[in-house]
Regions:
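Beta-strand elements within well-structured catalytic alpha/beta cores of enzymes
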Residues: 157-177, 191, 217, 372-378, ...
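Catalytic or ion-translocation cores adjacent to nucleophile or general acid/base/metal-coordination motifs
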Residues: 190-200, 403-405, 420, 427-478
Length: 672
């Protein structure tokens, strides 16, 4: 038991800043206990404080009891539930109240007063402690580390290093390099300056979005994912990558059963699981009880512990207020992005709840000695969609994630296994005002005009990523099933642009992924060629090609294969013939390969559109409701990065997620 408390004290010292931090923590604990005792005596008539010295001694006794008893309860009963440990703490405090009254430090009239007083004392203690620690992540995660040390006290130490992959969703390499130069990422900067870590670039191919990148990175197969959403002619419905049902189907198509995380890994906060045996907050496994872990110490602690619950509630409210203030300021100085409700709630969910919960789950998995671990932090990507990739709100998100990286590395040093880290992005983002704002109408309205009023056009251009990100959080928090799942699924499908399966398919479906859009004709079997489209909808393709907001249009031509139109010329992707001005000149060098790859997919739309791209400003015109976007071509959305141990070399920047997957396989196999 002496060794047990010595470990707790050592970890407390490490996470509070040494001896001085321990002293400050001790003083704060006593002061909070005194305040909680005063409030308890004030609100409960059956509890009376005799005098100031006696009250101080009573507060000291209660604080000491909580400090010494809580770790023991965590060690021995939290495997049942953190709620059991909390209940036992309250009962032990009630006994302490009664015993203290026997030595006349305080007066307690009846045993039930002691029980109610103990409960109120715990609530006040939790509220004040949570309020004081809202800005102190070290205190919060240090508490978790001490709890895990208590729970896993008999675990053997493993000397072989594990691997943790930290994905910063949507962060482009040029943006990261700007943060490093400005000193806003001190932890990553320190790793790179030490020479132990190296920053490299990699190029995601079309579509530049998470489901395709994660399919390639985690499963080594990104075929059949032409965008964030698309019309699936085989099933006659809209596929949306982050809807759990569709994510599960995507994983079924790309998985061989031997993904990057197979056999011993953990997936946290991802769209796809990489075949990990342990998954949390992962869209593809939310409905799979064999994969999605519903019970863990972290999930119990995060959603049941009063201290944790109150803390993240306060932080979430603060984040909503912060967003409302920043959105109002942005509206006065710039063209505002789409920041109306429910976005402030989505920002709180990603920037507070998902960030902290994912971090806690990573730390718990490290204490389980899991490897490899792959976690996706989505808060920067979500914020950048609405404020822009390099606005102050997005910069704050990157700085916050750098702090989280430091906390994860610090927690790894206390755990039973050493870990190596890889930090990467799945794609970047490109800035630019929405297509609808630039040209007065959304893409589906333009297509409606060109096709005719009698044509039924279904648009899927609303921003829905935050709905998909909130869904796993709600599922983990409440175990949504049955009617509740149906009720929460319905608005998601509506906002995604999905239709009721019982309804007749529309004539034209417009499915947007950033500044990429797939135009599909559900009534035309197979891939529709240009002559068939022109016959059914005269002037549609030509009208799109001539529109100033459209950078290129790819459509198959009978006898020639895919041809790219736009910018005063055409580019035959099969033969390489160019007539007039090459429409791909303004885009990145990998554009032709990316479009050929897209066309080869059976799931590709009949017509593929990419918006205009201004090479001077780096701006695109997203078809979705975003001012920072990805999914298509143009700008920094195609500039991803990877920070890795220097000895894990890369000969040349990988092109495509599958290529990077193969490189990572060579690193991870011996490491895990």
């Amino acid at each position: 038991m002496i060794g047990f408390y010595a470990t707790q004290l050592r970890l407390l010292s490490r996470w509070t800043g040494g001896r001085a931090g321990v002293v400050r923590r001790g003083v704060a604990t006593i002061v909070i206990a005194m305040l909680a005792l005063v409030v308890t005596a004030w609100l409960i008539p059956g509890i009376t404080l005799r005098d100031v010295p006696s009250a101080i001694v009573a507060a000291l006794a209660l604080a000491a009891m909580r400090t010494l008893l809580r770790p023991v309860l965590i060690a021995y009963v939290s495997h049942i539930s953190i709620a059991v440990a909390t209940i036992l703490t309250v009962l032990a405090q009630a006994l302490a109240f009664w015993l203290i009254s026997r030595v006349e430090w305080i007066a307690v009239d009846r045993p039930e007063d002691a029980l109610v007083g103990s409960l109120l004392f715990s609530i006040v203690n939790a509220i004040v402690t949570a309020m004081l620690s809202t800005g102190d992540d070290n205190s919060f995660f240090g508490t978790l580390v001490r709890q895990l040390a208590a729970r896993h006290r008999k675990r053997d130490v493993t000397r072989e290093p594990g691997v943790v992959f930290i994905q910063i969703d949507g962060l482009a390499q040029p943006i990261l390099e700007g943060h490093l130069r400005a000193g806003r990422c001190p932890n990553l900067g320190r790793w790179l300056r030490s020479g132990g870590m190296t920053l490299n670039s990699w190029k995601p191919l079309l579509p530049t979005q998470t489901s395709a990148s994660q399919a390639g990175l985690l499963h080594g197969n990104d075929d059949g994912i032409p965008g964030f959403r698309w019309w699936d002619k085989k099933t006659q419905r809209l596929m949306v990558s982050n809807h759990p049902k569709d994510a599960r189907e995507i994983q079924r198509r790309v998985s061989s059963g031997d993904g990057l995380l197979a056999k011993s890994g953990a997936s946290i906060g991802n769209l796809l699981s990489g075949d990990a045996p342990r998954s949390f907050l992962t869209a593809a496994t939310l409905d799979d009880p064999a994969r999605e872990i519903r019970r863990s110490h972290v999930l119990d602690w995060f959603f049941i512990s009063p201290y944790s619950y109150i803390r993240w509630t306060l932080l979430s409210v603060g984040e909503v207020i912060k967003e409302l203030v920043q959105a109002r300021a942005a509206a006065r100085t710039t063209s505002p992005g789409p920041r109306a409700f429910p976005y402030p709630l989505a920002r709180a969910a990603t920037n507070v709840l998902l960030r902290h919960l994912s971090t806690a789950l990573v730390i718990e998995e490290m204490w389980r000695r899991t490897s490899p671990i792959y976690v996706d932090f989505v808060d920067y990507d979500e914020i950048a969609h609405h404020s822009g990739p390099d606005r102050v709100e997005a910069r704050d998100a990157v700085a916050g994630l750098d702090k989280i990286i430091g906390i994860i590395a610090k927690a790894a040093a206390d755990g039973p296994r050493p870990y190596r880290f890889v930090v990467l992005s799945d794609h970047g983002q490109s800035p630019g005002a929405m297509f609808a704002d630039r040209y007065g109408k959304p893409l589906e309205a333009l297509i409606q005009e060109l096709a005719g009023k009698q044509v039924r056009v279904q648009g899927a251009t609303a921003h829905v990523e935050h709905w998909g990100r909130i869904s796993p959080l709600l599922s983990e928090a409440s175990g949504i099933n049955g009617m509740t799942r149906t009720l929460t699924s319905a608005p998601f499908r509506h906002h995604a642009g999905a239709r009721d399966d019982a309804k007749e398919p529309p004539d034209i479906v417009v499915a947007a992924s950033g500044n990429l859009a797939h135009i599909s004709f559900p009534g035309m079997s197979g891939r529709a060629a240009m002559d068939s489209i022109d016959a059914a909808y005269p002037g549609l393709v030509d009208g799109l090609v001539r529109h100033p907001g459209i950078g290129l249009v790819m459509v198959r031509v009978n006898g020639r294969g895919p041809v790219v139109h736009g910018g005063g010329g055409t580019h035959d992707l099969t033969e390489g013939d160019i007539k007039g001005v090459d429409p791909l000149t303004r885009f990145e060098p990998t554009a032709a390969d990316g479009l050929r790859r897209l066309d080869a997919m059976a799931e590709c739309g009949d017509v593929v559109i990419v918006s205009m791209f201004d090479a001077a400003s780096g701006e695109v015109a997203p078809f979705e409701e975003q001012i920072g976007s990805h999914g298509g071509l143009g700008g920094t959305q195609g500039d991803a990065f990877i920070v890795h141990p220097t000895e894990w070399g890369i000969d040349a920047p990988p092109v495509g997620a599958v290529t990077l997957h193969k490189q990572i396989r060579r690193w991870v196999r011996p490491a895990s």
